């Protein structure tokens, strides 16, 4: 079955990134190849068949949701008309996930309800050697407000779609954490719809897993919307962590801010692939999106040899009647001047390096609204730095 518009998408002649072909039908997409723009950084051979249809579901992921007043959780089948309101898959893996899940989890915050405590959603993988597909939708009804923490644990091979539907004048802070076991492969497609005068704070954290790829599409569906997309990732030897974003400004007077920061450390003596991170940030300002204010930044800190960071910011502007638009990207090693300054004040080099990395990530951690998550990330970064110091000592000896 060939869906309308597929040929244009394959040939790359869509008028802009917001008009890419989208379908729930996996057969409407060709099998990805390394030469395809959206897959050129992804190690397809390490995806265990998620991209070509050979990964049949052999297990299931478990999703548990904490109980909170004014929050309702439902389990529904694929035919539920609410599914897909956040967005439609734009790649084969996301379509495969939609075609293959057994049941979807819907988490809804009622109209005009302010949820005081964070809503915890725990996703436990299918386990080593097993494959699973999933679907999650978080909806904040009009004038509602909530903080949601989506925490991934366990292991296995997993692909899913996650929808964030933020109705008019609603506010959602969504913290998405990938803290998988080392052998995990996880491909996750996020679809966010932001209503009139609504606010979305979308935070992604990547720590564990073998290959983790998160693609997020954010659409403004009314004037006055506000989106902040934050990301923190720390890649070790052998890990591939990839973030791909598209912010689609299609209505007037909306604003978006994107800030992603990552650190990488490898081991040149290891037989594993280099630590590899990828960040691709696309922002589209359509002709009718006058008054747009947007900026995106990606920073990467390379701590050792045996690590590589790819960073690709893109900005498409179809109108000059905007408040502002820009992007910045930088990848580098430790700032020698910073280290010299700290060491000149009697701080040992190892401690000085820790201080620099803490400061590097501190800007993002401080923006996370959940104290428990902030503490957890601080501890995780300290653990990663211990690995860095251990690797350097081994290399020197």
Swiss-Prot record:
UniProt organism field: Mycobacterium bovis (strain ATCC BAA-935 / AF2122/97)
UniProt-recorded name of the protein: Iron-sulfur cluster assembly SufBD family protein Mb1497
Lineage: Bacteria, Bacillati, Actinomycetota, Actinomycetes, Mycobacteriales
Homology family: Belongs to the iron-sulfur cluster assembly SufBD family.
NCBIfam families: sufD
Superkingdom of this protein's organism: Bacteria
GO biological process, alphabetically ordered: iron-sulfur cluster assembly
InterPro entries: Fe-S_cluster_assembly_SufBD, SUF_FeS_clus_asmbl_SufBD_core, SUF_FeS_clus_asmbl_SufBD_sf, SUF_FeS_clus_asmbl_SufD
